[in-house]
Structure formats: C-alpha cells, structure tokens
C-alpha cells in the first residue's frame, strides 16, 4: 500500500517541463495553432519563467507575434505579468517597437502607467525607440507623460537623448515639461545641444525652453552646443539670448538695485573676520610702506605709534570694517557673475563697473577722512589706495577666488603695528605663497575673462555689422569709431593690468628682500604710489570710456531698430497714399475729359446753330412749297436733335451729380480711412452703373453725332441744290469747304476722344481692380459705419444677454468644476476600488488554487476512502464468516450440550446440567448482541462514508472531516499492519 506522503503529495505546477519548452519554441516560430494546442495541455503556462527569467508571453510581445498574444490572452493569461526585471508585455513591446502588439495589449486592458524595476513606463521605452505610433497610442491611453524614472528622466529627455525629433515634437505638443531635469540637472535643451539636433533645439526653444538654466556642474545649453561644435545651434541660441536680452533691457536698473540691495544687506550684516596675526605688518605685503614701521622696539602698553588716540583708532577700525563689507559685496557680485550665464555677463559687468566706480569714490572719501584726522598717516593712505586699486581689479575680473581675497584684504586693511625684530621667515613664506597663488588665479581668470570678452565682442561686432549694413553710412562710421575706441580701451586695460602685474612682482621682490633693503623700499615708495595712482586713473578712464562707448552703441542700435521699424511700417501706408492720389488724379482727369467733351459738344451745337442760321439766311425768301416742307422736316429733325441733346445733357448732369456724390463718399471714406466690403461693393456697383450710363450716353452721342452728320450731309445736299438755284458757286464752295473741314476736325476729335476714352477706361479698370484688391484686403477686418449704427442697439442687447449668459456659464462652470472635482474623487475612489477588487481577485484566485489543491487532495482521500471501504467490506465479510463460524460453534455446542445432557442425565445430577445450559445460553446472547452492534456500526460507517463522498464531490469538505478521514486511514493502515 502507498504511503501517506505519496497520497497527499501535490503536483508542483510551477516546475519547468517539456511542454513549456515546446511552447517557447512555438512562440519563437510564431505558430499560433501550436501555441493554442500546447496551452490546452496539462502543466503548460505562458507566464512561467525559464532559467533566464523569460516567459512565453513576453517573448511573443518581444517578437511582435500578435496572433500568439491573442491566443494567450484568450487562454486567460495575466496581462500584467512581469518578468524577472519587472517588465510587463507592454514594456517589452514598446522596447522592441511593435505598435500592433501595443494596440492589442492596450485593448486587453494592460495598464499603460505600470513601471518596471528602473521606474520606467512603456512610454519611456517607446520614446527611446523613437516609434511615433507607439508614442501616440500610449499618449492616447493616458500614459503619464511627465513621470520620471530612477535616473530622473521623463520620456521627452529619453527621446532627446536618442535623437528622435518627431517623438520630441509629439511629446511637446501633448504637454511634456520643457524644463524638466534629470539627476544631473540637465534639461532637454542641453541634451539636444549635446547631440547636435538643430530641429529638436528649435522646437524646444519655440515651446519656451529656458536658456539660463544650468546643470549641477554649472554648464548651460550654450556650453553643450560648443561641445557638439554645431554652428547652427550656437547661432540659434545666441539669437535667442540676444532677443531675451533685448526684452530684459528695461529691467536692468532693477538688477542694479538688486545687486545694491544684496551688497547693502551684506554690508548691514558683516561677517566675522579673524584678527591678523601679530607678526604680519603692511611692510610684508607691499614695498610702498615706510621703513618707520619696521623697528626693533617693542610695542608700548597703551597704543601703537601711529594710532595714539582712542577715537582715531575706533574710526580706523570702522574703516576696516567698511572695507571688509565692500570686499564681501564685490565677492557677492563675483558670485553673481559665476552663477549668471554667458549672455548676461556683459550686462552684469557694466553694473559691476559702476559699482567699482562707487567703491573708488567711497575709498577716496575714506582717504580724505584719514588725511583730515592725521596728516602723518601716509603709509596707511598708500595701503588704502593700493587696496582700492586691488578691489577694482577684483571687480573687473569675472570670478576671483574669495579665499585669495580674504587674506590680502585683511592684511592690507590691518593697521601698521610695530613688531619685534625677530619675525619668522615661515610667516613671510606663507604670505608670499598665498599672494603667488592669488596672482596665478587672477591671471588665469583674467585670461579667461578676456577670451570670453573677445568672443562676445566678436559676436556683437558681427551682429552689429549685419544690422549696420542696412543703415546709412553715418551709423557704420560711428560703429567703426566705437569699435576702434573699444579696442583702444581694451589695449589700455591690458597695459594697465600688465603694469599691475609688474607692480605686484616688485611687491614680491620687496617682500623677499625687505629686511636687507629697507632703504631701497624707501626710495621706491614715492614712484610706486605715483604709478598706482596713474594706473588707477588710466583704468577709471578706460572703464568710463568703455561704458560711454557701450551706451553710444546701444543708442545707435535703438535708433537703428526704430528706423527699421519705421521703414517696415512706412511702405504700406505710402503705397496706399500713392494709390489714393493716383486714383483721385485719374478721377479728376476723367472729369476734366468729360468737361472737355461737354465743351466740345456745346461748341458743335453752336456750330450747328450757326450753320442753321446761315442756311436760314441763305435760303431764298421765294422758295417753293417743297422747300417749305423740307424746312418743316428739317425743323422737326432739329427739334428732335435738340430734345436728344437735352436728354443727353440731363444724363450728363445726372452722371456728374453721381460723380459728385461719389467724390463726397470718397472724401468721407478717406476721412474714415476704410469702408465695409458691402458698402464698397455697392459703390462699385453704382460706379459701374454710372460708367455704363456714361458709355451708353457716349454711344448715343456718337449715334446722334452720326445722325447729325447724316442730316448735315442731307442739309448740305439740300443747300447745294438750293445754292445751284439761288446761291453763288464761290459762296457754296466756301461753305462746303468750311463744312468739310469742320466735319473732318470733328471726326478727328471724335476718333481721338474715343481712343483717349478707351485708354482711360482701361486705366480705370486697372485702378478699380487694384482698389478692389486693397479694399478686399482691408475690409475683412473693418466694420462699416452704417451697419455699426444699425447693429449697435442689437449688440448692446446681445451683450446684456451674453453677460447674463456669462454669469450663468460662470455658475455652471463652477458647478462643473465642483462636479469635475467630485468626478475626480469618484474616479480616484473607483481606482482604489479597482485596486481593491484586483487584490480581492488575486486573493480569490489564490483561494481558487487552494480549493483546487484541496479538491485534488479530496480526490486522493476519496480514493483512499474507497480503498478503506473495500477493506471494511472485506472486514465485514470476515466478520460474517466469523459470525457464521460462531453460529456453527454454537450449534455444535448445543449438540454437545444435548449429548452432554443425555450423558449427564445418566451420570450426573440435574443441577449441574441446568448451570451449564444457563452459561451456554448467556454466551449465545452475548454473541448475538455483538453481531447486532457490528451491523449497526457498519451501517453508520457506510452512511458517514456516503455523506463525506457527497461533500467531497460538492467541494465542501471541512478540516474536521479531513482530520477524521486521516484518522480512518491511519486506523485502516494499523489494521492492515496487524493482519
């Protein structure tokens, strides 16, 4: 019989088997049918990890087998299952750039916001891969776009690092943080400059990337663009920096105020200074001090030699504190220079130069106070003047070391105290080394600052030359003069710095040989003071000249910008004015030509009247009746012609009135500058109608003129006929010639006028087209006055209605905001409930697995119970056999008793027989009772087995029942062992 462990041993479903190997191979080959058949087999699971931590589900996502993924999901695979590195299938699909797999997984409710062990979402991997479709899908399914991984990278930074500009554009359009930083403080703009992607840099700048941000090492985007050596990116950044600087120029006085506030705050709360050591004196720092300070006599118990009075000593200490405050303020300004970007250094340098000038003035005031207090303190004054010069030098340097300034300032500002003759050489060596280190630092920083200044000046000169080429020659000459002056100031500044370095070298030599060459230092004192003063003056002049030159350059730049703006704004206005003037001149010319034509028409009418008069005078009084009829016909024709002429004159007057109205409207339009499109169309329609009428009038005039000519010819014929009868030939010829000449002149004039009129009509058409285009361009944005007056009342009512609607919409918006907040809270609660449901589902799944295991155990126990029932049935059969044997023995005993009774009856007494019979009867009763009890127990056991079997089939076995079954099995085992 099997052991109890073998009965209750549960099969380990997580063990790797052959089916799992086959499943991996099928997924590798992309065989969806084989995957489906293998998943139906026992022990095969798509989320089971192999030795490398890989699963079949993740392999399908990595290979991009969509059909395999479908089959696995339909077989109940957990979509959120992770591999050994915490990647879900969505992470793997995004990492390998399979948008179809991503779409399917998102359809199967795979969460897009899940992160792996490195804190990355699927969007991080899609951005790193540069797959635009994958990025779009994940953004549509609300993947967090500004979530940082463990390295501090958001998807935008990852896309920029890998140079995927399209993904960067998409992420920026969907709300990615432009100024987000990683662990090292680098922004997306810095990374784009480092990779040399000009398109990405342009997109980031357009989206508002901050160019003044620096990383943890203090480098800005311009530094990274220099590393990539991309000139296009550098020019782009410099142009943006210059634009920002132009926008910030009005706020420069505020910056100056802020710097002054910082310096005042620092001066208001001075730092604690360490007292200088007693052996150090001003003679150890400069050879300009007097040898009187180096004496072998010890200090007196009250005061020093130079500062004998207590108030004077207090004032000197206050001066020293002021100097320390000033040095602190300059150090603060230097720290501002270190923090600021390269583009703002020039502006801050101007502010600091102004600050240097104020500091020198303050030093001069302090020197004047010292001179007023004690005329004997020339050595202290020389020290103070040298200290002021040193402060100007530190202010002009871009970022001098604070540690190198503190000992020098303390040593220089210390009062000249006498020291004993036994000064140690170690202190002098330490001071010399400190001064040498500070000098080296100053030289390096001066060189770096000069290089940066040259770069900035070259860039400024290039920009200025580009802008100044557009301007006149005067500005270019001024710019060249200013550049020459700047170069001269730079050369002066360099010469001054060289002289300062030579003086400092002489100071070092004086420090090394101060004990042996006191007389030499005394001789060099006066020229050193003079050199320092001259250098100070030269330096101040150079600084002032450079400031003036910069101011002039800025003024010229502002003037140039104003001129460019004026030139940019002027041409359209001038063009409009020229068009208006040309249009007005054309209209005036047309009116003049019409007046000229009207005059010509009147002249022609006068000539016709004259001809009629001459005809009347020349007609004979004794004319026949036919001539009277002809006269009447001619008079009728003349009347008709007069009527037509009057009608034409009326039409002309109407056209002239319309022209005057049009002129008035045009003047009103010019006063109002523009008209509405509808009004313009109406005016154009009126002008077209007037032009059509004028053309019709002209055509009618031409037709009438032709009729008049025809009539004139007829009249001439009649006159000729009459003249043949009555008038002389000479007069007739003269009249004919005059008429012909006048007719020819009239025809020539008419032809010239028609050609001129055609040209003018073409010009009018061109001008009308131009005017229509201009007014169409302008009228879209203008409102007509007529419609404005009509719509004003309606608009006011609409405004009131809209105001009420706006109030209602504001209320509704507030309600909507509250509802949105409620919805958000409900969504958060729903998410929490979803998480709780997921946890409950996981717990239920665990319970289901436990129940399945229990069911398997119950099945095994049922099998054991069946075996036990078989054994119990065998036991019952054995018991039945025993009972039968017992009954047989009882019968045998009865027979024996009967035989014994017969024998005993014959041999023994009756009393003994009765006792034996009683004993045998008692034994028989006991055996019968035992049989009945065995049957009852057997029935009870069978009923219990049946009940437990039913519970096991229904899956409702209790722990107590399991314990009882185990006990039964142990009992059966013990019984079998006993047998």
Swiss-Prot record:
Residues 247-259, 446-457 have a biased composition (Basic and acidic residues). It is found in: Cytoplasm, Cytoskeleton; Cytoplasm, Cytoskeleton, Stress fiber; Cytoplasm, Cell cortex; Cell junction. Residues 349-374, 430-943 form a coiled coil. SUPFAM superfamilies: Ankyrin repeat. GO terms for biological process: cell differentiation; spermatogenesis. A motif (Nuclear localization signal) lies at residues 270-276. The modification Phosphothreonine is found at residues 249, 295, 297. Highly expressed in testis, where it localizes to seminiferous tubules (at protein level). Expressed in ganglion cell layer and in Muller cell fibers of the retina (at protein level). In small intestine highly expressed at the apical and lateral borders of absorptive epithelia (at protein level). In liver highly expressed along the bile canaliculi (at protein level). Interacts with PALLD. Associates with actin. However, does not bind F-actin directly. This is Ankycorbin. It comes from Mus musculus. The gene is Rai14.
């Amino acid at each position: 019989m099997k052991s109890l462990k073998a009965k209750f041993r549960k099969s380990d479903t997580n063990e790797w088997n052959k089916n799992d190997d086959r499943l991996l191979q099928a997924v590798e080959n992309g065989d969806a049918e084989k995957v489906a058949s293998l998943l139906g087999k026992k022990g095969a699971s798509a989320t089971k990890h192999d030795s490398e931590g890989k699963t079949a589900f993740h392999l399908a996502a990595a290979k991009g087998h969509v059909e395999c993924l479908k089959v696995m999901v339909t077989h109940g695979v957990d979509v959120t299952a992770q591999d050994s590195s915490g990647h879900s299938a969505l992470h793997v699909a995004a990492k390998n750039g399979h948008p179809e797999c991503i779409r399917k997984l998102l359809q199967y409710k795979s969460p897009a916001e899940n992160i792996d062990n490195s804190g990355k979402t699927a969007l991080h991997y899609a951005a790193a891969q540069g797959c635009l479709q994958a990025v779009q899908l994940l953004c549509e399914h609300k993947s967090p776009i500004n979530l940082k991984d463990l390295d501090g990278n958001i998807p935008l930074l990852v896309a920029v690092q890998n140079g995927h500009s399209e993904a960067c554009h998409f992420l920026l359009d969907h709300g990615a943080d432009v100024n987000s930083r990683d662990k090292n403080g680098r922004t997306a703009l810095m990374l784009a400059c480092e990779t040399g992607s000009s398109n990405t840099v342009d997109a980031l700048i357009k989206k508002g990337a901050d160019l003044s941000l620096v990383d943890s090492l203090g480098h800005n985007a311009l530094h990274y663009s220099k590393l990539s050596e991309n000139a296009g990116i550098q020019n782009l950044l410099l142009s943006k920096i210059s634009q920002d600087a132009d926008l910030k120029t009005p706020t420069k006085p505020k910056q100056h105020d802020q710097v002054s506030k910082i310096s005042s705050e620092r001066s208001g709360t001075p730092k604690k200074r360490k007292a200088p050591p007693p052996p150090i004196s001003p003679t150890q720092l400069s050879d300009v001090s007097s040898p009187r300070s180096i004496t072998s006599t010890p200090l007196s118990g009250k005061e020093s030699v130079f500062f004998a009075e207590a108030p004077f000593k207090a004032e000197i200490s206050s001066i020293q504190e002021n100097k320390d405050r000033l040095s602190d303020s300059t150090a603060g300004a230097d720290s501002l220079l270190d923090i600021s970007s390269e583009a703002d250094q020039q502006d801050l340098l101007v502010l600091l130069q102004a600050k240097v000038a104020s500091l020198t003035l303050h030093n001069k005031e302090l020197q004047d106070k010292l001179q007023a207090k004690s005329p004997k303190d020339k050595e202290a004054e020389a020290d103070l003047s040298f200290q002021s010069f040193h402060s100007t030098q530190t202010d002009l340097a871009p970022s001098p070391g604070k540690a190198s300034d503190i000992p020098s300032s303390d040593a220089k500002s210390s009062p000249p105290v006498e020291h004993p003759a036994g000064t140690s050489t170690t202190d002098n060596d330490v001071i010399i080394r400190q001064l040498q280190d500070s000098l080296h630092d100053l030289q390096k920083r001066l060189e770096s600052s000069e290089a940066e200044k040259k770069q900035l000046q070259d860039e400024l000169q290039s920009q200025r030359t580009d802008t100044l080429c557009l301007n006149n020659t005067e500005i270019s000459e001024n710019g060249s003069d200013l550049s020459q002056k700047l170069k001269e100031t730079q050369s002066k500044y360099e010469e001054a710095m060289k002289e300062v370095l030579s003086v400092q070298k002489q100071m070092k030599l004086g420090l090394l040989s101060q004990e042996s060459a006191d007389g030499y230092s005394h001789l060099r004192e006066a020229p050193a003071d003079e050199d320092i003063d001259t250098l100070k003056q030269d330096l101040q002049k150079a600084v002032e000249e450079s400031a003036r030159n910069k101011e002039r350059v800025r003024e010229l730049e502002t003037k140039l910008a104003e001129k460019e703006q004026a030139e940019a704004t002027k041409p359209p206005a001038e063009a409009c004015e020229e068009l208006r003037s040309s249009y007005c001149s054309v209209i005036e010319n047309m009116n003049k030509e019409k007046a000229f034509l009207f005059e010509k028409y009147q002249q022609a009418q006068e000539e016709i009247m004259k001809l009629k008069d001459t005809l009347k005078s020349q007609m004979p009084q004794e004319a026949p009746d036919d001539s009277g009829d002809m006269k009447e016909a001619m008079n009728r024709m003349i009347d008709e012609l007069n009527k037509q002429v009057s009608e034409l004159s009326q039409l002309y007057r109407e056209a002239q009135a319309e022209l005057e109205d049009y002129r008035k409207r045009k003047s009103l339009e010019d006063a109002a500058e523009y008209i509405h499109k509808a009004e313009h169309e109406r005016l154009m329609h009126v002008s077209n109608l007037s032009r059509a009428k004028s053309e019709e009038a002209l055509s009618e005039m031409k037709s009438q003129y032709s009729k008049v000519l025809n009539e004139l010819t007829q009249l001439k014929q009649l006159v000729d006929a009459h003249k043949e009868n009555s008038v002389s030939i000479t007069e007739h010829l003269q009249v004919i010639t005059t008429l012909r000449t006048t007719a020819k002149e009239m025809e020539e004039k008419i032809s010239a006028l028609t050609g001129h009129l055609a040209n003018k009509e073409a010009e009018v058409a061109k001008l009308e087209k131009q005017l229509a285009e201009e007014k169409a361009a302008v009228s879209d944005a203008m409102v007509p006055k007529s419609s404005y007056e009509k719509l004003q009342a309606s608009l006011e009512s609409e405004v009131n209605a809209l105001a009420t609607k706006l109030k209602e919409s504001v209320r509704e918006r507030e309600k909507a905001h509250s509802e949105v907040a409620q919805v958000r809270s409900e969504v958060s609660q729903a998410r929490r409930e979803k998480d709780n449901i997921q946890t409950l589902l996981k717990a239920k799944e665990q319970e289901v697995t436990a129940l399945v295991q229990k069911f398997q155990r119950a099945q095994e126990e049922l099998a054991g119970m069946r075996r036990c029932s078989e054994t119990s049935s065998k036991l019952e059969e054995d018991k039945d056999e025993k009972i039968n044997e017992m009954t047989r023995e009882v019968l045998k005993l009865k027979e024996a008793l009967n035989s014994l009774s017969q024998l005993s009856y014959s041999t023994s007494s009756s009393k003994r027989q009765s006792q034996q019979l009683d004993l045998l009867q008692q034994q028989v009763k006991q055996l019968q009772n035992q049989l009945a009890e065995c049957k009852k127990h057997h029935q009870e056991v069978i009923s219990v087995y049946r009940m437990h079997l039913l519970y096991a089939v229904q899956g409702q076995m209790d722990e107590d029942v399991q314990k009882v079954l185990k006990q039964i099995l142990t009992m059966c085992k013990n019984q079998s062992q006993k047998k």
